[in-house]
């Protein structure tokens, strides 16, 4: 064990950075995430992803919440409806690695994800709260 009570981390021989930090940086810089819905869930998710250095864009109809998110998190925001293809294109959904639909409407979240996948998003995740939508 190294002085200070921590084990030494492997270091990348080219940069001198800890190897884990370099992997996290490369992973984070490569992923673009679009979040539709800037309520408690959407904002909390954006906050965590920004901390981890992901490229985050948030979409919502409410300009006041978008301004709050843009100011607090220094991210791009798009005012519009998450089921609108034009809004999703403006937010970058066709090139997104992940779109998360986290509005307060299960139906909007599902349509948003279907639209995003149709536009080319690699993955789409809908927040679904109604147990009637559970397959099985």
Regions found by a protein language model. Give the residues of each.
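Cytosolic regulatory regions of ion transport systems
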Residues: 1-8, 12-136
């Amino acid at each position: 064990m190294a002085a200070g009570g921590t084990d030494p981390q492997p270091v990348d021989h080219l940069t001198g950075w800890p190897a884990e930090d370099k992997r996290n940086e490369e992973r984070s810089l490569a992923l673009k995430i679009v979040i539709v819905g800037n309520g408690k869930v959407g904002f909390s998710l954006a906050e965590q992803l920004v901390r981890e250095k992901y490229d985050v864009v948030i979409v919502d109809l409410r300009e006041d919440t978008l301004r709050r998110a843009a100011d607090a998190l220094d991210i791009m925001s798009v005012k519009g409806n998450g089921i609108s293809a034009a809004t999703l294109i403006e937010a970058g959904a066709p090139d997104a690695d992940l779109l998360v639909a986290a509005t307060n409407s299960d139906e909007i979240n599902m349509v948003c994800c279907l639209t995003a996948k149709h536009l080319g998003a690699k993955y789409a995740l809908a927040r679904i709260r109604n147990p009637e939508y559970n397959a099985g």
